[in-house]
Structure formats: C-alpha cells, structure tokens
Regions:
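Membrane-cytosol interface segments
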Residues: 1-53
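Phosphate/pyrophosphate-binding loop motifs in nucleotide- or prenyl diphosphate-using proteins
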Residues: 31, 39-227
Length: 227
C-alpha cells in the first residue's frame, strides 16, 4: 500500500505515550507522508511490533479496532471525522495545498508564502499537542504593523483596496484562492475553538488564522501595485 499524508494521519498510533506509525513490509510512503512524520516527530516502526491496543473515545469507551469513520483527535483519543477540530484540520490541509501552488506560481513568492505555510503547519501541531502558538512576526511584520497595512494599503504600497478580476495576473488569482482557503480555515476554526457561549478556547490559533488571510491579502496588494 502507498500511504499519503491523510492515510498516515489517520493511522498514527500511540505506543507507550509516544506517537508512532507502523509500516508493513512492502508498504511505501509518499514524500508528503514522510515529511509529515518527520515534521511531527512520529517514529516509523515495523508493523511486526504492533500489538493489539484499545482506542479511547471521548465518552470514555474503548475499541479494539479503529472504525473507518473515526480518526485521531490527538495521540490518545478517537473521534468521528466530522468533529469540528477534524474538519478544521481538513481545511488546513486544503490551505497548505493552495499555498504550495502559490509558491510554484512565482519564485518571488516562495519565501513570504513559505512563512505562511510554516505557520499553518505550526497551528496543526499546536492543536494536536495542545501547545501555545508562539508570538512573532509574519513576513517581517508584527500583528499591529500588519493590521495598519491591511486597513490602509494606499499609504504603504500606493495601491488601494481592490476586488480581483479576470484582468489580473495569474499570481493574484492564486493568492486570492489561498486567501479564500485561509478564510474558510478561519471560519472552521471559530466553530472548533469556541465554547457554547461563543468564547474562544484557543484565541492564539484564531488570531494566527486571521493573520494568515490578512497577509495573503497584503501579498495581493503588493502584486497589484507592480502593474
């Protein structure tokens, strides 16, 4: 079997408190799947070392086998694939794909979009491992600097707000698709990380999601100003 990143994520197991992935003889990993395991520091073990383990559900019940309609909420817990946090991760997968296409569209975008891509991948890690999102600059800008530029682009780039159209170059269209994907991920994040009263449970993740879509808009502004 050839495992891609989604297959791998669905089959990560917990072994003595650590996340592992069992790979059977003859099975292979795509480069994306191997990068994911390396990035998340998930050890690859031969399938012979796998032993019967029970999967824990959110309601406290246990299962001996993982049902196809369920996946790991974290290294310990299984939940249905329509859980809000799982849906959020799916939106983030789409965003990652769109960001990579932006990098391929123009070499000059490789570095700034790469920073946004790195942040997107960090957010998934912070969700899965319940880690805080570190504060920092994005594409050289603090949150306040980014906010001022996105509100008043004319003052900083000589380019007012605009709506992308068929007359724009392909790079702007690519960036706009990625911006839309970032917005969809942000909306999914609000569903996943707000309690019943609407209070954010992960304001750091929600703040970072907003910064990503805003930064992609600034990159669109910069590209538009070059015309």
């Amino acid at each position: 079997m050839l495992y891609n990143q989604e297959n791998v994520r669905d089959n990560v197991r917990n072994r003595e408190g650590k996340r592992v992935f069992y790979l059977a003889k003859g099975d292979q990993l795509t480069s994306g799947a191997r990068d994911f395991l390396s990035r998340e520091r998930i050890e690859i073990l031969p399938a012979e070392l796998a032993r019967a383990e029970s999967y824990r559900l959110l309601n406290g019940a246990s299962l001996e086998e993982k049902p196809e309609h369920m996946t790991h909420l974290d290294a310990q817990i299984l939940d249905p694939k329509n859980h809000p946090r799982i849906l959020f991760r799916g939106k983030m997968d789409t965003l990652e794909a769109e960001l990579i296409l932006c990098q391929l569209a123009a070499e000059r975008l490789a570095a700034p979009v790469g920073e946004i891509l790195a942040l997107a991948r960090r957010l998934i890690r912070c969700d899965v491992l319940n880690e805080p999102v570190p504060e920092g600059k994005l594409c050289g800008l603090t949150g306040d600097e980014q906010r001022r530029r996105s509100h008043f682009p004319q003052d900083y780039y000589g380019q007012p707000h605009f709506m992308p159209g068929v007359g724009d170059v392909d790079v702007i269209a690519r960036l706009n698709r990625a911006r839309c994907a970032a917005r969809e991920a942000e909306l999914a994040g609000v569903t996943a990380f707000c309690d019943r009263e609407g209070n954010p449970t992960r304001p750091d993740i929600l703040r970072s999601l907003n910064r990503m879509s805003s930064m992609l808009y600034l990159l669109m502004i910069q590209e538009k100003s070059k015309k």
